[in-house]
């Protein structure tokens, strides 16, 4: 079950929720009715602090915040080498198709085409020891 809360305060890209709302540190969350992407950056018994990675203009106290149950992460795969992304790994070409030259708030786009097959040559096999920097 994912954690949920409501916005209590807003200060630029930082929003606050009252009390312990059940989120985890570094958890990716969706903020407001526009489902803006954010990350939990502080947890105390009094409040939860979240940094929103999109423009927060128009957000207001009382709007919902929904957790994903997973940390903010990036997809690593051969397909990302030929794409250009914004700061939260949304491919700019997919965003342009959806919103034109400007990035609308709350746009969600997969960072990788999951239908495409990627050919990879594995250089390790089961049981091999791996070392840092190798």
Enumerate the language-model features and the residues they cover.
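Acidic-enriched and Gly/Ser
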Residues: 2-3, 9-11, 17-134
